[in-house]
């Protein structure tokens, strides 16, 4: 495995859209008791359900610690799911795993961004995070893929979405937050994104979803469904703290053009809830110094936008909410050639994210 000192763009690589063919999807097995209630057992059942749903469409590799390997292997009893032993600090592989890039000659490489647990010592969610910062490298070594490392640039995969044709969507709330890359200007951040993902146009939404503890990851708020079309979390309730965020994002999207000069078509996705953790759910989480405590009075950042596109399928969260059926119908309408599979997402949400956050697609090699 090589470690190029150049950039993906200079070497002819780009980040593909999520709907381009996958070789597999990666996940990490949850166990951290100060984030996942009841020793992680309810979350493990939820992750297993997601893995098995994905495995209907493509191979899945789940990374588990030495202490959880045997348990994970037993619970993931599907021939299309591989379990490998990798140590980590938590289970958010979208943010800790590599961002894969491809060229037109059949090669796949990975970008290994710096990781600081969503803010380091200024708002980060736990410490230490060293093992999480090593996850991308370990995955790339297992796959024997070349690795581009950005030691001086922090980024989480959930903070970006691309259309595969030169346009990236992100949020100012996250990427311009002083707890990520305070030494860089917006222009310098854009230059890094262009160099490592081979994008031309960057659309900056002001904020992500209200109370998203990642500082507003775009993958919980707005995503591409095809070139020129996006899906935006939405509420018409003017008393909802998300209302102004949705309105501001819509204005930016309607005024933007992508790298191909297209105006964007915006599809609206209702926001579930409002959703809250119960006192019992919060009491099941260990209280540990350096970790974020759970509070039943704080609204959860639930979103149907936090889904994964797989080969021929859409794996999306449900919340036992009246809007679940509408969300499924919208996803089926915007993805008419995919099968929409809804998987219970509450346990994942209680930990701070959802299906897109706990998965990382590895694109299939392609030749022009």
Curated annotation (Swiss-Prot):
Active site: 357 (amidino-cysteine intermediate)
Segments crossing the lipid bilayer: none
Catalytic activity: agmatine + H2O = N-carbamoylputrescine + NH4(+)
GO molecular function: agmatine deiminase activity; protein-arginine deiminase activity
GO biological process terms, semicolon-separated: putrescine biosynthetic process from arginine
Cited SUPFAM superfamilies: Pentein
EC number: 3.5.3.12
Domain of life: Bacteria
Keywords for the protein's UniProt record, in alphabetical order: Hydrolase, Polyamine biosynthesis
Record carries keyword Hydrolase: yes
Pathway it works in: Amine and polyamine biosynthesis; putrescine biosynthesis via agmatine pathway; N-carbamoylputrescine from agmatine: step 1/1
Annotated NCBIfam families: agmatine_aguA, PRK13551.1
Family note: Belongs to the agmatine deiminase family.
Function as written in the Swiss-Prot or TrEMBL entry: Mediates the hydrolysis of agmatine into N-carbamoylputrescine in the arginine decarboxylase (ADC) pathway of putrescine biosynthesis, a basic polyamine.
Record text on subunit structure and interactions: Homodimer.
Protein name (record): Agmatine deiminase
Lineage, broadest ranks: Bacteria, Pseudomonadati, Pseudomonadota, Gammaproteobacteria, Pseudomonadales
